[in-house]
Curated annotation (Swiss-Prot):
Organism: Lactobacillus helveticus (strain DPC 4571)
Domain of life, source organism: Bacteria
Protein name according to UniProt: Small ribosomal subunit protein uS8
Coiled-coil spans in chain: none
GO CC term, one of those recorded: ribosome
Described function: One of the primary rRNA binding proteins, it binds directly to 16S rRNA central domain where it helps coordinate assembly of the platform of the 30S subunit.
Keyword list, A-Z: Ribonucleoprotein, Ribosomal protein, RNA-binding, rRNA-binding
Oligomer and partners: Part of the 30S ribosomal subunit. Contacts proteins S5 and S12.
Family designation: Belongs to the universal ribosomal protein uS8 family.
SUPFAM superfamilies: Ribosomal protein S8 (SSF56047)
């Protein structure tokens, strides 16, 4: 079966593993998924990730993060720009997620970055997802 939205699949696998309190989740690799994983790690939403070669496209193993009492660090993940309805914004119109408590992941000419970094660089782009 052909997957029409691999980024939505990536976010859904993380969301489902997080809800089931799994320690880690394996996801088929791609460059944009690696970039999103790096952002999630840098912003403190996941513990770590590693890319393994499986003689095909590779696999990203994402290690989920939980609080000291087992509470989830990721409260929500939402896909914004979809293949059927792309969502592009200018630098002035970049969204704030939960008044700055969450992040928007934006694909720009400067790479895949957070909404905060995009504001600092004054670049707009495609809003991929919200994470809070």
């Amino acid at each position: 079966m052909v997957m029409t939205d691999p980024i939505a699949d990536y976010l859904t696998r993380i969301r489902n593993a997080n809800m089931a309190k799994h320690d880690s989740v394996e996801i088929p690799a791609s460059n944009i998924k690696k970039s999103i994983s790096e952002i999630l790690k840098r912003e403190g939403f996941i513990r770590d990730y590693e890319v393994a070669d499986d003689n095909k496209q590779g696999v990203i193993k994402v290690f989920l993060k939980y609080g000291p009492n087992g509470e989830r660090v990721i409260s929500g993940l939402k896909r914004i720009s979809k293949p059927g309805l792309r969502n592009y914004v200018s630098a002035e119109d970049l969204p704030k997620v939960l008044n700055g408590l969450g992040i928007a992941i934006v694909s720009t000419s400067a790479g895949v970055i957070t909404d905060k970094e995009a504001r600092q660089k004054n670049v707009g782009g495609e809003v991929i997802a919200y994470v809070w």
